[in-house]
């Protein structure tokens, strides 16, 4: 960030002055600043020679500052690489700001300065590139939570995100026990697990007139055959099973990301198509084809096995109290 500031200052110095008079004033101020720095350096040098302890503290401080600058620069390089490798998919909104929030940049530089490992540098690099793509993704609170996240909780969250669909993950796919989910909740990454939440499938009909339950997005989803109904679906009053019929609707329990968790999930690679495929397999149980992953193609809606008689694309599920 500091390197960018210096580059910007040079650009202003070259093109930002309107006429020769202002350029002269600017240069005079620069010369004065350089003289003040030189004078300060001389005074500091004399003090260091007279006080060995001060010299040692100064050397330690300079070394620390140099390491911090290297950490920031390395994180910045990784952010630039990520932007080059993964350009924004859509057009930039008309109201998108031209510059990033200075408060965000200051806080990001503070945290990135402590990134001593390649993994942590990559994390802060992705955070910066994500914020550049979509300003406002990371609040100051989110940055603080991410900085304070311990290694064990970070690993748990990565496991959670491997089953993520949008802002939630199906309980059917989560390989996390109650204590691990509680750790994510206490870290502020998911919403309170005690209050059950569920998504509701919509009902649809395929080209042969067969009835299905469907859930997904504009591009892909999962469809569940109503007859015969998979054995993984349970029925009955006061039923809180992961996949159940309630009020004549198919509901599926999910764990939901918090705002902080949703922002952090953006920088964690995951394959949503593979998640839908896994979900279809789990729901099918011992009945092959009872649930299928579907996707939208140029030819229309296709099931994972290539069938063109897949049910219409479902709408994204709305999370409700279970």
Write out the residue ranges for each language-model feature:
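Extended alpha-helical scaffold and adjacent linker segments that couple domains
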Residues: 1-16, 20, 27-29, 33-61, ...
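Accessory beta->alpha helical hairpin/"wing" motif in late/C-terminal subdomains of nucleic-acid enzymes
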Residues: 102-112, 118-132, 191-282, 286, ...
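Basic amphipathic alpha-helical segments that dock to polyanions
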Residues: 175-191, 196
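Non-transmembrane, amphipathic alpha-helical segments
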Residues: 108-112, 141, 145, 176
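Long, low-complexity, charge-rich intrinsically disordered regions
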Residues: 278-322
């Amino acid at each position: 960030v500091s390197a960018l500031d210096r580059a910007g200052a040079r650009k202003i110095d070259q093109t930002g002055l309107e006429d020769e008079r202002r350029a002269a004033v600017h240069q005079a101020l620069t010369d004065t600043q350089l003289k003040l720095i030189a004078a300060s350096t001389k005074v500091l040098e004399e003090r260091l020679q007279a006080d060995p302890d001060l010299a040692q503290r100064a050397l330690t401080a300079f070394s620390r500052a140099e390491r911090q600058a290297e950490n920031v620069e390395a994180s910045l390089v990784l952010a630039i690489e990520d932007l080059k490798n993964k350009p924004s998919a859509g057009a930039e909104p008309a109201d998108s700001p031209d510059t990033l929030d200075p408060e965000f940049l200051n806080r990001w530089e503070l945290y990135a300065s402590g990134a001593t490992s390649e993994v942590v540098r990559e994390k802060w690099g992705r955070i910066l590139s994500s914020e550049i793509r979509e300003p406002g993704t990371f609040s100051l609170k989110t940055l603080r939570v991410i900085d304070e996240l311990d290694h064990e909780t970070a690993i748990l969250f990565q496991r959670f995100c491997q089953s993520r669909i949008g802002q939630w993950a199906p309980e059917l796919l989560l390989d996390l026990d109650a204590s691990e989910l509680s750790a994510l909740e206490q870290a502020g990454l998911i919403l309170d697990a005690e209050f059950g939440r569920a998504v509701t499938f919509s009902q649809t009909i395929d080209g042969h007139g067969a009835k299905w339950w469907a859930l997904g997005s504009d591009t892909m989803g999962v469809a569940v055959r109503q007859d015969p109904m998979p054995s993984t679906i349970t029925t009955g009053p006061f039923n809180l099973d992961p996949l159940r019929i309630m009020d004549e609707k198919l509901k599926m329990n999910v764990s939901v990301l918090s705002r902080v968790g949703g922002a952090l999930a953006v920088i964690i690679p995951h394959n949503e198509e593979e998640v839908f495929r896994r979900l279809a397999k789990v729901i099918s149980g011992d009945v092959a084809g009872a649930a299928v992953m579907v996707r939208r193609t140029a030819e229309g809606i296709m099931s994972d096995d290539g069938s063109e008689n897949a049910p219409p694309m479902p709408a994204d599920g709305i999370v409700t109290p279970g």
